[in-house]
A protein has these predicted regions:
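Cyclic nucleotide-binding regulatory module and flanking cytosolic helices
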Residues: 1-35, 76-77, 81-83
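Phosphate-/nucleic-acid-contacting segments
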Residues: 158-229
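A cytosolic small-molecule/anion-sensing beta-strand core signal
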Residues: 31-32, 50-51, 72, 96
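Glycine- and acidic-residue-biased ligand/ion/polar-headgroup-sensing regions
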Residues: 44-55, 73-74
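Cyclic-nucleotide recognition modules
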Residues: 18, 23, 69-127, 131
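Short phosphate-coordinating micro-motif centered on Lys-Gly-acidic
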Residues: 35-41
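Polybasic "coupling" helices that flank or enter modular domains
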Residues: 113, 117-182
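Short beta-strand segments in beta-sandwich/barrel cores
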Residues: 35, 53-58, 76, 99-100
Length: 229
């Protein structure tokens, strides 16, 4: 993890702009797998992602995590725990090299306490995160594993995009794909093998290449038929 002094950045509208313009702002650089914060730790501050990506996850059992959300540039982390004054309810770890702007919990609370506009932005940011997580849960809750994976890939395409080689602009391990799809690692391997045989995707070294996007969309919408479970 590398620590840098605050620098001037292009400002966006909303809460992230307020954080970026704070005089005590600090920047951190987290490398892949570096931990921003852990579940049940007391919050130290607010993180605004400037570049890179972070997985928000919850421990289900020792060594077993469930990815709840994949956060990208412009998203704010740690807000709920800081505002409500309780421990982190989940953990955050970088999945790529990630640069964040950081403001301490005390500085942030001082910033918003006397400003109703800032309080409203906090509420909007919290609601947006909840909506995003709920949408992911709803989209996959009633699908079979192969449909869930197809839907997950569509979400990842929308979030990260594809490069010229039709590969996702994010590398994810089998474990991470399984966790975000809400299936087991063994099923995920079977699904990837099945999708490869069907000409939908290929997977190598963390990279997912999309071979047939229209068929992938069709698979995500299926409600019947053979499943891998």
């Amino acid at each position: 993890m590398k620590l840098e002094e605050s620098t001037m950045m292009v400002a966006n509208t909303g809460l992230e702009e307020i954080i970026r313009n704070h005089k005590e702002l600090t920047q951190f650089i987290f490398h892949k797998d570096d931990i921003l914060f852990k579940e049940n730790e007391h919050p130290v501050g607010i993180y605004c992602i400037e570049s890179g990506s972070v997985k928000i996850c919850k421990e289900e059992s020792p060594g077993q995590e469930r990815i709840l959300h994949l956060a990208i540039a412009g998203e704010i982390l740690g807000l709920h725990s800081v505002v409500n004054g309780h421990v982190y309810t989940n953990s955050a770890a970088a999945i790529t090299e990630t640069r964040v702007s950081f403001i301490t919990a005390s500085d942030f609370m001082e910033l918003i306490n006397d400003n109703n506009t800032y309080k409203l932005l906090v509420m909007k940011s919290l609601c947006s995160r909840i909506d995003s997580m709920e949408d992911h849960i709803v989209r996959i809750s009633e699908k079979m594993s192969d449909e869930r994976f197809a839907d997950t890939l569509l979400v990842l395409i929308e979030k990260y995009g594809l490069n010229k080689s039709k590969e996702l602009n994010i590398k994810l391990s089998i474990d991470e794909l399984a966790s975000y799809t809400c299936t087991s690692k063994s099923y995920m391997k079977k699904i990837i093998t099945e999708f490869t045989h069907r000409g939908l995707v290929t997977y190598s070294g963390g990279s997912v290449k999309i071979l047939n996007l229209p068929l992938l969309r069709t698979t995500a919408l299926l409600n019947a038929g053979a499943a891998i479970d």
